[in-house]
Amino acid sequence: MFLINTLLLILPVLLAMAFLTLVERKILGYMQLRKGPNIVGPYGLLQPIADAIKLFTKEPLRPLTSSPLLFIIAPTLALTLALSMWLPIPMPYPLVNLNMGILFILATSSLAVYSILWSGWASNSKYALFGALRAVAQTISYEVTLAIILLCILLMNGSFTLSSLITTQEYMWILLPAWPLAMMWFISTLAETNRAPFDLTEGESELVSGFNVEYAGGPFALFFLAEYTNIILMNALTAILFLGSFHSHTNPEMFTVNFATKTLLLTMTFLWIRASYPRFRYDQLMHLLWKSFLPLTLALCMWHISMPIMLSSIPPQM
């Protein structure tokens, strides 16, 4: 039964990810005054399927000097970690109701750094290694602010379980009292998922394509799948943390529809930002984090710790 439940979670996520690639190309197309994919199937709806068939039927080429085992393990690990992060997400009931659900997601997203680092190192190419080191520095840096913002939310929530956030936000979204945190969280998730304007790992002008430059066919598709799965996951997490949907026990599917709509709108904002903004310079990226976000999030964290103590109260206990 658990296997069936797992498949029923993974398959819709993969399907959503496949069509996200189409939505992205359509949005970019319309923002650049062109149509986007419109040949394969009606309105280009079969384009993701055609892309998948093309990539997975290609010959998986590997550089002669690469490390064969790590070269294959890296993309597999990337996708496995991206999918495993969906386990504690409540929709409205999680597949695995972990006591430390948020901590699990944070730890698993940190492990994703290894797949990027291994892919860059195993490729035995200087461009891939530079791209991987950039990605690792960026991901590790922005995880600091993500962790502190999560701590602030948990202090308001009073529990580490994601399901309790639904109860906390029954009457008011956490977005309203904590909008500075929400803004910094959203920008940090952009950087965490290596999306524009923080896509420095894929700087075509200086790094050809980034850490996946030596990958082709199936292994490249796995990295692609992992990236887009992470984008949907981060937006799903944003929807749960800041835009909690109302959950009625008599009508739980309404929560799922509400949650999916919010996730879709946030994901489309990601794509809209990609179409609108140029890429940051690397020093600007690091300056934004270490000199702007980190002091602000630390100050807000101290504020959220001191407020309950000052008011002689404790956060709501589940």
Swiss-Prot record:
Specify the enzyme's EC class, one word: translocase
Q: Which InterPro entries match?
A: NADH_UbQ_OxRdtase_su1/FPO, NADH_UbQ_OxRdtase_su1_CS
Q: Which cell locations does it reside in?
A: Mitochondrion inner membrane
Name a single GO cellular component: respiratory chain complex I
Q: What is its EC number?
A: 7.1.1.2
What Pfam families has UniProt attached to this entry?
Answer: NADHdh
State which residue ranges cross the membrane: 2-22, 69-89, 102-122, 146-166, 171-191, 222-242, 253-273, 294-314
Protein's GO biological process:
mitochondrial electron transport, NADH to ubiquinone; mitochondrial respiratory chain complex I assembly
GO terms for MF: NADH dehydrogenase (ubiquinone) activity
Reaction equation(s) it catalyzes? a ubiquinone + NADH + 5 H(+)(in) = a ubiquinol + NAD(+) + 4 H(+)(out)
Q: Sorted alphabetically, which keywords does the UniProt record give? A: Electron transport, Membrane, Mitochondrion, Mitochondrion inner membrane, NAD, Respiratory chain, Translocase, Transmembrane, Transmembrane helix, Transport, Ubiquinone
Topology with respect to the bilayer: Multi-pass membrane protein
Purpose: Core subunit of the mitochondrial membrane respiratory chain NADH dehydrogenase (Complex I) which catalyzes electron transfer from NADH through the respiratory chain, using ubiquinone as an electron acceptor. Essential for the catalytic activity and assembly of complex I.
- Describe the subunit structure: Core subunit of respiratory chain NADH dehydrogenase (Complex I) which is composed of 45 different subunits.
Q: Provide the family line.
A: Belongs to the complex I subunit 1 family.
Xref: PANTHER family: NADH DEHYDROGENASE SUBUNIT 1, NADH-UBIQUINONE OXIDOREDUCTASE CHAIN 1
Q: Which HAMAP family match?
A: NDH1_NuoH
Recorded protein name is: NADH-ubiquinone oxidoreductase chain 1
Q: Which organism is it from?
A: Oryctolagus cuniculus
Lineage start = Eukaryota, Metazoa, Chordata, Craniata, Vertebrata
